[in-house]
C-alpha cells in the first residue's frame, strides 16, 4: 500500500534548477537539513560541527554563503519516474502550504510559503554552494528549500528507510515536511532567536544542543502537518506512519555515528537520537498542535 496523494493541490513554488551547472570549488552551504550532510572542507567551531565526527546527519547553521558562481542553464528531459517524483514533490509542498496557511490564519498570522529548488549534483544558493551529498536543507538566508531528488533513492539504498518507491512515499513526504518545518520556525521567529544564542555560545557542545532542539521541533512540525493532512484527505494507508518512523530512526545521530565510526559521541549530536526523532514526530502527529512541539523549553527530549 502507499499513501494517496492524487487530490493534493500542486504548488507553483517548485523551481527546477537541475540544468544549472556551477563553476568554482566547493563551499559548504549554511542551511538547515534533515540529516544526510557530509561536509567537505574546513568547518569552524561556530558552526557547531566537530570535524572528528563528521557524519551523514551533521548540521550547519550560519549566516551568509559563498560568492555567486557563473551558471549555465540546460534543458532537462524527464523520464516517467522522474516526472512522477516532481509531481509528488509539488503535491506535498502544495499541501504543506495549505495546511500551514490554515494554522497561521487561526493564529492571526500570515504564512509566506518558501520556494523549493530542485537541483542535480550542485547548486549555488543563498547559503552558499550545495552538493547532493548534503541532502535536503532549508536556507534561512533566501528562504528556499533545496532538494536533489537522488536523495529519495538514497533513502532506500543507503539508509534502508523503506523498501521500494511505493513504500517510500510517506517517508519522502516526511523529508519534505521536515524542511518546511524549518521554514515555519523561520516564519515564527524561532530560527533568528536560536541562531543568536548559537552565535553567543561558548563552545560547540552548547551550539549542538540548541541544534538538536531545532531539528526535533522540525520533526514535530512534520508530524503536525501529517495530522492535519490526514484530517483533510484521509490519505494515509496502513504502514505509512511506520515508514516515516523508520526514516526518522535511520537518520538519527546515534545510529549514523555507530554505523560510521563504531561508537557514539552524544555531545556531537546535531539532530537527536533515533528515539528522540520518532518521539517528537509522533508528538506532532498524534496531537496536530503546534503547542505540542515546544522542544526549546522541554526538560526531556
Question: Where are the predicted features?
Answer:
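Short, Lys/Arg-enriched N-terminal segments with co-localized hydrophobic residues
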Residues: 1-2
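A Zn2+-metalloprotease active-site environment signal
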Residues: 8-21, 25, 29, 33-270, ...
Amino acid at each position: 500500500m502507499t499513501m494517496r496523494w492524487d487530490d493534493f493541490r500542486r504548488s507553483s513554488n517548485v523551481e527546477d534548477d537541475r540544468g544549472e551547472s556551477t563553476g568554482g570549488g566547493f563551499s559548504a552551504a549554511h542551511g538547515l537539513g534533515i540529516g544526510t550532510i557530509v561536509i567537505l572542507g574546513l568547518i569552524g567551531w561556530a558552526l557547531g560541527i566537530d570535524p572528528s565526527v563528521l557524519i551523514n546527519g551533521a548540521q550547519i547553521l550560519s549566516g551568509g554563503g559563498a560568492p555567486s558562481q557563473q551558471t549555465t542553464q540546460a534543458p532537462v528531459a524527464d523520464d516517467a519516474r522522474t516526472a512522477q517524483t516532481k509531481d509528488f514533490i509539488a503535491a506535498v509542498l502544495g499541501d504543506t502550504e495549505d495546511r500551514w496557511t490554515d494554522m497561521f490564519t487561526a493564529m492571526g498570522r500570515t504564512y509566506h510559503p518558501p520556494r523549493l529548488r530542485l537541483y542535480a549534483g550542485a547548486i549555488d544558493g543563498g547559503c552558499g554552494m550545495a552538493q547532493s551529498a548534503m541532502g535536503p536543507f532549508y536556507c534561512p538566508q533566501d528562504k528556499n528549500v533545496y532538494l536533489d531528488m537522488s536523495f529519495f533513492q538514497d533513502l532506500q539504498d543507503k539508509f534502508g528507510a523503506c523498501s521500494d518507491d511505493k513504500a517510500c512515499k510517506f517517508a519522502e513526504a516526511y523529508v519534505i515536511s521536515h524542511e518546511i518545518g524549518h521554514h515555519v520556525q523561520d516564519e515564527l521567529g524561532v530560527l533568528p532567536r536560536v541562531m543568536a544564542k548559537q552565535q553567543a555560545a561558548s563552545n560547540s557542545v552548547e551550539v549542538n544542543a540548541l541544534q538538536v532542539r531545532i531539528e526535533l521541533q522540525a520533526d514535530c512540525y512534520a508530524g503536525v502537518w501529517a495530522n492535519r493532512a490526514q484530517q483533510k484527505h484521509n490519505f494515509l494507508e496502513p504502514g505509512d506512519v511506520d515508514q516515516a518512523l523508520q526514516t526518522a530512526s535511520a537518520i538519527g545521530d546515534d545510529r549514523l555515528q555507530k554505523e560510521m565510526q563504531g561508537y557514539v559521541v552524544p555531545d556531537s549530536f546535531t539532530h537527536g537520537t533515533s528515539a528522540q526523532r520518532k518521539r517528537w514526530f509522533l508528538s506532532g502527529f498524534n496531537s496536530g498542535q503546534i503547542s505540542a512541539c515546544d522542544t526549546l523549553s522541554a526538560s526531556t527530549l
